[in-house]
Amino acid sequence: MARLPILLLLISLVYSTPSPQTSKKIGDDATLSCNRNNTTDYVVMSAWYKEPNSIILLAAKSDVLYFDNYTKDKISYDSPYDDLVTTITIKSLTARDAGTYVCAFFMTSTTNDTDKVDYEEYSTELIVNTDSESTIDIILSGSTHSPETSSEKPDYIDNSNCSSVFEIATPEPITDNEEDHTDVTYTSENINTVSTTSRESTTDETPEPITDKEEDHTVTDTVSYTTVSTSSGIVTTKSTTDDADLYDTYNDNDTVPPTTVGGSTTSISNYKTKDFVEIFGITALIILSAVAIFCITYYICNKRSRKYKTENKV
């Protein structure tokens, strides 16, 4: 054990000579080996380290000791031919593995009993070709499979490029001099406006469908008007039936598409968040007002009850 510090000191003091080069690619395994010239002396220990000052391993016969976070999974050691050759294999090369590796032999003479230690070292420069990394990336990116595509037709057809002219004939308003309410009845064929007191009855016929024939597709818009005469004036209601929902390119989250039942069109609207907030605020205000009235009433009644009990005791 006393020789180990001396041997480590010798390793740090010896300068390596120009070394041969070994070139490998990233991901490959590199095997580095060296042969000793003195074949007569006894090998006490062999060592591998990486310049400038990183000790990889120390080996004595079959015992191997790793340093500086090196493990046998990364670097394997072998010493065949009766310690004449020492070999290491660096697995899965990375750019950090490039550098100068030095192998060293520590030997003693077999003919005398002196403590003299002979030292031999040999260096090898390992070059890791980093250009292969980009080549691997290109190969991998070129072998990727494109995602599967579906041949189904879209739910809508964008007819923004289609040019069409719509002409809508607006029916004449119905004038009713009677200042009475009007009942509106819907039939499957048309929309009738009937006055409860007037003798005259008028029927608004639905205009002819409007057809847009562009790019082999048809868009039909049916527009009907309902005119109601009241005491405040004439109110005209417009109802639109779109029988080409397939070509609707805009989705409105606030409204529901018109629902057609028996030829009549009814537009159904969803409540917005603002409406619910207003309803909730009004309800909360009513509840708070009721609680306040209850508390005031309870306080007055309790005060009178206490006053009445006090007077009775007196």
Curated annotation (Swiss-Prot):
InterPro entries listed in its UniProt record:
Ig-like_dom (IPR007110), Ig-like_dom_sf (IPR036179), Ig-like_fold (IPR013783), Ig_sub (IPR003599), Ig_V-set (IPR013106)
Zinc listed as a keyword: no
Main localization (coarse): virion
Q: Does the keyword S-adenosyl-L-methionine apply?
A: no
| Residues on Intravirion side | 303-314
Q: Which residues form the signal peptide?
A: 1-16
Q: Which Gene3D superfamilies does the record associate with it?
A: Immunoglobulins
Please give the SUPFAM superfamilies that the UniProt record associates with this protein.
Answer: Immunoglobulin (SSF48726)
Q: Which Pfam families has this protein been placed in?
A: V-set
State the source organism's domain of life. Viruses
- How is this protein induced? Expressed in the early phase of the viral replicative cycle.
Disulfide bridge map: C34-C103
- List UniProt keywords, sorted A-Z: Disulfide bond, Early protein, Glycoprotein, Hemagglutinin, Host membrane, Immunoglobulin domain, Late protein, Membrane, Signal, Transmembrane, Transmembrane helix, Viral envelope protein, Virion
PTM annotation, UniProt: Glycosylated; contains phosphate and sulfate-substituted glycans. O-glycosylation is required for hemagglutination and hemadsorption activities of infected cell membranes.
Glycosylation annotated at which residues?
N37, N38, N69, N112, N161, N253
> Which cellular components does GO assign to this protein?
host cell membrane; membrane; viral envelope; virion membrane
| Entry similarity comment | Belongs to the orthopoxvirus OPG185 family.
Q: How does it assemble?
A: Heterodimerizes with OPG040. The heterodimer OPG185-OPG040 interacts with components of the entry fusion complex OPG143 and OPG094. Heterodimer with C3/VPC protein; disulfide-linked.
Q: What protein name does the entry list? A: Protein OPG185
Q: Which organism is it from?
A: Cowpox virus (strain GRI-90 / Grishak) (CPV)
